Regions:
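N-terminal signal peptide c-region/cleavage motif recognized by signal peptidases
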Residues: 14-16
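Early extracytoplasmic/lumenal segment of secretory-pathway proteins
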Residues: 19-94, 104-105, 211
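Alpha-to-beta junction loops
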Residues: 74-80, 138-139, 202-207
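Ligand-binding "clamshell"
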Residues: 91-106, 217-231
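A conserved helix-loop-strand patch within extracytoplasmic ligand-binding domains
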Residues: 92-165
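A bilobed periplasmic-binding-protein/Venus flytrap-type ligand-binding module shared by bacterial periplasmic
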Residues: 116-124, 239-256, 273-277
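Ligand-binding pocket segment of bilobal, Venus flytrap-like solute-binding proteins
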Residues: 166-233
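Extracellular/periplasmic juxtamembrane helices and adjacent flexible linkers that interface
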Residues: 249-329
Length: 329
């Protein structure tokens, strides 16, 4: 027995010596803090069980466009989990991510979805019910800046798509509609969480154009006695995307764990965590379980209405694009 005990002790010691300590950096967009705090704990436990290795995931959050720029400029993110595919494409264009990144994971590397809704104050005093109510005189709108925020670009395109569908696809009328909406914007923060804080904490504005997950988080955390969610008649299907940063994981030798980290987002546990944090899950079984949590509405895609992100970025958000044109007061 003594001999067996010594051998077992040596086995434990050797296992402990072989276990690695790994660090990953996830550079993400603004309102995913709570999601990834929970997900990182779950993945670390999963990876420990699978491999014996200890993995610690650090998080960085900000406007999606600014976060992409930080990765382009050299911040050593192992993975990016950004608000939209264009921001990942921008990193890929600089050679830091494989240009075929979007095909590496299911659903075009978008493991969960969201949409754009309105958060209003209790009682809905300005009677906000749909996009057309946001252009009424005297309505103060809060939304982030599309130049820095991915969420803001989804907001803008959701409004534009609504205007197209209600004006026989007349682009000029859609531009007039979105221009009128932005004339009512009181504060343009750099990111979605900043806009939420402006509306919720600082008490500025009548309506916040928000990620659905951010609106649900605000009502659940701060109380339904203070805010209400208004789901418009139609909105855009927002598809946040994820990728490992090839140049970084090759340099740091973290490719295996970075790949596993992103793939686990599609697992039943990963999908459950996404749903609990008010993102719409891709997994059909998990989606069915949370069916009552997400209102039904007509959703259109960026490909259907805008011809994809590359075209939308060029037409609307590049220097001299329609956002710059409508921003001239």
């Amino acid at each position: 027995m003594k001999k067996w005990g010594v051998g077992f002790t040596l086995l434990l010691a050797s296992t402990s010596i072989l276990a690695k300590d790994i660090q990953l950096l996830n550079v993400s967009y603004d309102p995913t803090r709570e999601l990834y705090e929970q997900y990182n704990k779950a993945f670390s436990a999963h990876w420990k069980q699978e491999t014996g290795d200890n993995v610690v995931i650090r998080q960085s959050h900000g406007g999606s466009g600014k976060q992409a720029t930080s990765v382009i400029n050299g911040i050593e993110a192992d993975v990016v989990t950004l608000a939209l595919a264009y921001d990942v494409d921008a990193i890929a264009e600089r050679g830091r991510i494989d240009k075929n990144w979007i095909k590496r994971l299911p659903d075009n590397s978008a493991p969960y979805t969201s949409t754009i809704v309105f958060l209003v104050r209790k009682g809905n005093p300005k009677q906000i019910h749909d996009w057309n109510d946001l252009i009424k005189p005297g309505v103060s709108v809060i939304t982030p800046n599309p130049k820095s925020s991915g969420g803001a670009r989804w907001n803008y395109l959701a409004a534009w798509g609504y205007a197209l569908h209600h004006n026989n696809n007349d682009q000029a009328k859609a531009q007039d509609f979105v221009k009128a909406l932005f004339k009512n914007v009181e504060v343009l923060d750099s990111g979605a969480r900043g806009s939420t804080n402006t509306f919720v904490e600082r008490g500025i504005g009548d309506v916040l154009i928000a990620w659905e997950n951010e609106a649900l988080l605000a009502t659940n955390e701060l109380g339904k006695d203070k805010f209400e969610i208004v789901t418009p008649s139609e909105s855009i299907l927002a598809e946040p995307t994820v990728s490992m940063v090839d140049k970084v994981v090759e340099k740091k030798d973290t490719k295996a764990v970075a790949e596993a980290y992103l793939k686990y987002l599609y697992s039943p546990e990963g999908q459950e965590i996404a749903a609990k944090n008010f993102y719409r899950p891709r997994d059909a079984d998990v989606a069915k379980k949370y069916d009552d949590a997400f209102p039904k509405l007509k959703l259109f895609t960026i490909d259907e209405v805008f011809g994809g992100w590359a075209k939308a970025q060029k037409d609307h958000f590049a220097n001299g694009g329609t956002f710059d044109q409508i921003s001239k007061r």
